[in-house]
């Protein structure tokens, strides 16, 4: 590959890598685009989405791998199979160091380039939400003080995004809805605050329903899909809470 490409060429190469399902390389092309751009230069919506898709795919397969390995580890522990437990633990550590590396990579990019150069509210919310997401992914596998720090950083980023979204974006905007979805998942899965999670998801859903007629055609599909996910989570969480109350 030529050492440096033009911006359009990086976009083209990122799309090519996406088609070939070579997501690590897609990440590299988008990183080079971001670091090569002058700091004041904001990414276009297309570039921003390519960056997000690249990282989402890389982190997605690692998170799935971590969940599978962790579940095997629990099974081996319940079987008291110490030799296997030790092997699985080492393997889990390897996956965790890869997870840490990917999260650190995007978080560094967000703090050094993307958030400082974001001018429009939509971009700010997009990147702050992304920052919250990757701190949340860290909180999923870290423990002790590291988990606590990751959770605090998640909260700060989501809160900052939420403040801007509430002031400047319609309740039906897909980025604002996506933020509410992920923020509520954070409350439920990381902080174990079922009530907070349900209230946040319910409020976002109801506010969007109330303004459904303002939805533009271009974002209709995205917004209604996220609303459906909010509703699915609400259904699942309330039934889980009901079961726990019944058991108690």
Curated annotation (Swiss-Prot):
Keyword Membrane recorded: yes
Pfam family, one: 14-3-3
A GO cellular component entry from the record: cytosol
Sites of Phosphoserine modification: 70, 112, 193
SMART domains on file: 14_3_3 (SM00101)
Phenotype for residue 70 to A: Reduced phosphorylation by CRPK1. Impaired phosphorylation and loss of translocation from cytoplasm to the nucleus in response to cold
An annotated GO BP: response to freezing
Biological role: Is associated with a DNA binding complex that binds to the G box, a well-characterized cis-acting DNA regulatory element found in plant genes. Specific negative regulator of slow-vacuolar (SV) ion channel. Mediates F-actin dynamics possibly through inhibiting ADF1 phosphorylation. Negative regulator of freezing tolerance that modulates cold-responsive C-repeat-binding factors (CBF) DREB1A and DREB1B proteins stability by facilitating their ubiquitin-mediated degradation when activated by CRPK1-mediated phosphorylation in freezing conditions; this processus is counteracted by B1L.
Sequence similarity: Belongs to the 14-3-3 family.
Name used for this protein in its record: 14-3-3-like protein G-BOX factor 14 lambda
Organism: Arabidopsis thaliana
Higher taxonomy: Eukaryota, Viridiplantae, Streptophyta, Embryophyta, Tracheophyta
